[in-house]
A protein has these predicted regions:
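Short, ordered loop/turn segments at secondary-structure junctions
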Residues: 136
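Conserved RecA-like P-loop NTPase helicase motor core
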Residues: 151-156
């Protein structure tokens, strides 16, 4: 069997579930919880969603991203509730828990220079030994231009800029 499980990554692992669901779904949930709870995670690769109006508001992931909001003086830090930020924090948590590993995401690039992302950058610098970021730019709102003066275009058909991020511990 290919080790792919149906689960919400941004939810904390739960104790093994009972028979509330059909056996196959219960078995799937139990196996996913075992992976999340007891298996060392050494490499996380993905392209998390960029959703500023996230519906992923579970207590576990919210408590993890609270680290990124600590000591901020801004009145609003909604940008830190974006799903891609939660997935970066999710990956950071598991790599920290393991003591070593690689987190590789293509994501929204606003954390690179966002004012409200200061603590996020600080925590990432404290967690990882090496950080490599390839800023692909492409943010339509910034109206950036290429070195030759042409309009900067996104690699995807989206308004938000993109970066390829590699975090190594």
């Amino acid at each position: 069997r290919l080790k792919i499980y149906l689960t919400n990554s941004l939810e904390e692992s739960h104790p093994d579930t009972g028979t509330l669901f059909a056996n196959w779904l219960s078995s799937e949930a139990n196996e996913a919880n075992f992976i999340k709870r007891d298996t060392p995670v050494m490499c996380i690769v993905g392209n998390p969603p960029y959703a500023s109006s996230s519906t992923n508001k579970g207590k576990w992931i919210e408590s993890l991203t609270a680290d990124y909001k600590k000591d901020l003086k801004e009145k609003s830090y909604n940008s830190l509730s974006d799903d891609y930020v939660k997935f970066i924090r999710f990956g950071q948590y598991f790599i920290d828990k393991n003591g070593s590993g690689i987190l590789a995401y293509i994501s929204n690039n606003s954390f690179i220079d966002g004012i409200t992302h200061r603590q996020m950058r600080k925590h990432l610098l404290e967690s990882f030994d090496k950080i490599y970021i390839l800023d692909l730019h492409g943010n339509a709102k910034k109206k950036e231009v290429c070195l030759d003066g042409s309009v900067d275009q996104n690699v995807f058909d989206i308004m938000q800029g993109v970066s390829i991020n590699l975090f190594v511990k």
